[in-house]
Amino acid sequence: MTFTELIGNVGLVGGAVMLCLALLSLVSVGVILDKHRKFRTAARQSQMFKPVFGKFLRGGELQEVIDSLKLHQNSHVAQVVSAGVLEYDGVRQAGRDPLGSIELVTSALRDSMSETLIQLKGGLGFLATIGSTAPFIGLFGTVVGIINAFQSIAATGSGGMSVVSGGIAEALISTALGIFVAIPAVVAFNHFTGKIENFHVEMNRASSQLVNCLFQIPEVKAPEIEVREARAKDVKVTEVAHASR
């Protein structure tokens, strides 16, 4: 019996299950391709934006960063930096003291990061749902196929292949199709989740660097380093006092 003949023997419920799984598979592939395109664009534009941002951190002009932000709107790093830079520039343009706007800038960075993460995670919930439910939908079709096979045996009083082939085909195809739909969705979900974690780290780093640069926050020293420096200073003062005597 060919595969086409097996499909032809599938019952109404089994056919509905397979159609549902096929539609889920098509939607899943569409979501995966869309997320891959967006993530690749975000990564590429972020790599292009980082040299401009790095130049600003080393003493470059703020206006260069603002102009570059317009060219890299799909970059997750640029989106977060844009919120902080525009907030800071708005305070400066209004004639207020920029040094007093650190809370406004950090709040804008935090809100922008949250919004960017929501955008990056869009569609992942659907992939997770498909990955977790598709095998169970296939299992439902399997159970229905086995039931149909037993009903055929009961109706004919025999258990030949021609009697149970429809039910067995329905059971096996539903199981295979459910697993086939679930595997790409789960793999893609895990892959994109890892990408988002990396993007989150990059956005956090850029936010910290921006705040430190705008407000000239000194690097925090470890307590043991501060103690050593204080002791060295005391020793130097003592030596100078002895020398003066």
What label would you give each PLM region?
Residues 171-185:
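Hydrophobic alpha-helical transmembrane segments of polytopic membrane proteins
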